Amino acid sequence: MRPNARAINQPRPIKITRHYTKHAEGSVLVEFGETKVICTATVEDSVPRFLKGQGKGWVTAEYGMLPRSTHSRMQREAAKGKQGGRTMEIQRLIARSLRAMVDLEALGERAITLDCDVIQADGGTRTASITGACVALIDAINFLLQNGTLTTNPIKGLVAAISVGIVNGETVCDLEYVEDSIAETDMNVVMMEDGRMIEVQGTAEGEPFSHAELLTLLDLAKQGCEQLFVAQRVALAE
């Protein structure tokens, strides 16, 4: 039986709280069960040097975990003097995922940075970050539309992400830490609301998985993301 007696295709309880901080153009607290991430969107009227003069905008992301977001205290990466490989991989994934939902030409020569700060980790921090940052990004775009900076909405659609895996021989959706730590297969799927996939990251931690199991995992991810899109729409309607 899964933790909290969840069905195999049932994500953890999802909660998205908008306008969570005061200063950012968009801010969200996203909760996937006990995993909690603050996502803020910051708008700047400039772009990276490689984009200057091209009439296009940019969306990027940074990711970090508070020292006591986990069971034992982690040293801050700032104290170490460099970012770890996991951090860089995750923030690039978040940035790629969010760029897929934006028409960068319609955004104009401005950049939006999504900061995803994990305040409590219980598995799925990268998928929660993407799902919450999507809403924060939309709020930042709405801010630009409302003040007249933008006249065309550059948002193509919602983006959400969820983990799936094989645990004790069973395919399951939205793994929490106790499942993730023993999973035979672990996969993260990022999807647009029209069903197209942005990224699939899958690894066999033990026994290799079959083609049939892969298709089952992707179907579970689609079912899970559809529930996340509902949660995003509900939050954006509030």
From Swiss-Prot:
PROSITE patterns: RIBONUCLEASE_PH. It is an enzyme of class 2 (transferase). Keywords: Nucleotidyltransferase, RNA-binding, rRNA processing, Transferase, tRNA processing, tRNA-binding. It catalyses: tRNA(n+1) + phosphate = tRNA(n) + a ribonucleoside 5'-diphosphate. Phosphate binds at residues 86, 124-126. The keyword Transferase applies. GO terms for molecular function: 3'-5'-RNA exonuclease activity; tRNA binding; tRNA nucleotidyltransferase activity. InterPro entries: ExoRNase_PH_dom1 (IPR001247), ExoRNase_PH_dom2 (IPR015847), ExoRNase_PH_dom2_sf (IPR036345), PNPase/RNase_PH_dom_sf (IPR027408), Ribosomal_Su5_D2-typ_SF (IPR020568), RNase_PH (IPR050080), RNase_PH_bac-type (IPR002381), RNase_PH_CS (IPR018336). Its EC number is 2.7.7.56. Homohexameric ring arranged as a trimer of dimers. Belongs to the RNase PH family. This is Ribonuclease PH. It comes from Histophilus somni (strain 2336).
